[in-house]
């Protein structure tokens, strides 16, 4: 299981739970809340992982602002999550433009199968994410509006940015069983296997 997030304390924080499959991802769950710190999120995420039937998490992808220290703990969110999940599990999404992340989201969403029940509020946010239109100039803004929809959308596109490279591609030619092969194909397979013997 892989998790991507957008962090916020006074703002909302959003968390997407991903499962790699051949050709894309099952998006299992979206969770969000506001006013919570890392110490509140860690047990909640661990509980969500258990509820989803996973034994552990492969990676948690966090935005670059996870490196900022807080006044309350004097530690970064990244450090707190590393303590809760392990050093090797926490990664920071590389800095790119929001436009690049949106493009990654547009590309990867075609390869995602969503649990409509557990992702309902996150999907609402993805549908509602929009650019502001300037009537006077007849153009859209360069960046989407920052509102309630930006939290699930940012969390989703952070995940898309790093996960688009890891999509498991289906085999070009599906394997044939012995009863589907011609006699010549069986002889060729046999020759190849014999040549690899010691």
Where are these regions (language model features)?
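Short, hydrophobic alpha-helical segments
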Residues: 159-167
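Short glycine-rich loop/turn motifs
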Residues: 11-15
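Short, low-complexity Ser/Thr-rich regulatory SLiMs
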Residues: 7, 19-20
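Histidine-centered active-site/metal-ligand motif
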Residues: 151
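Two-metal-ion RNase H-like nuclease active-site motif
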Residues: 1-9, 62-63
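Internal mixed-charge
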Residues: 155
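Mg2+-dependent endonuclease catalytic cores in nucleic-acid-processing enzymes, primarily RNase H-like
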Residues: 16, 22-147, 166-170, 176-177, ...
């Amino acid at each position: 299981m892989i998790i991507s997030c957008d962090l916020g304390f006074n703002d909302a924080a959003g968390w997407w739970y991903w499962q790699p499959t051949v050709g894309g991802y099952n998006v299992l769950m979206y969770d969000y809340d506001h006013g919570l710190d890392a110490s509140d999120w860690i047990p909640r995420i661990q509980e969500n992982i258990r509820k989803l039937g996973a034994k552990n998490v492969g990676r948690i992808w966090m935005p670059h602002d996870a490196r900022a220290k807080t006044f309350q703990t004097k530690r970064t969110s990244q450090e707190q999550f590393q303590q809760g999940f392990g050093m090797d599990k926490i990664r920071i999404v590389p800095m790119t433009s929001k436009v690049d992340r949106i493009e990654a989201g547009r590309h990867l969403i075609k390869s995602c199968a969503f649990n409509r029940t557990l992702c309902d509020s996150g999907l609402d946010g993805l549908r509602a994410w929009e650019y502001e239109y300037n009537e006077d100039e007849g153009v859209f803004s360069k960046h989407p509006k920052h509102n309630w929809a930006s939290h699930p959308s940012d969390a989703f596109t952070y995940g898309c940015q790093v996960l688009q490279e890891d999509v498991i591609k289906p085999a070009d030619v599906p394997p044939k069983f012995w009863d589907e092969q011609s006699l010549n194909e069986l002889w060729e397979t046999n020759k190849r296997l014999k040549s690899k013997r010691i």
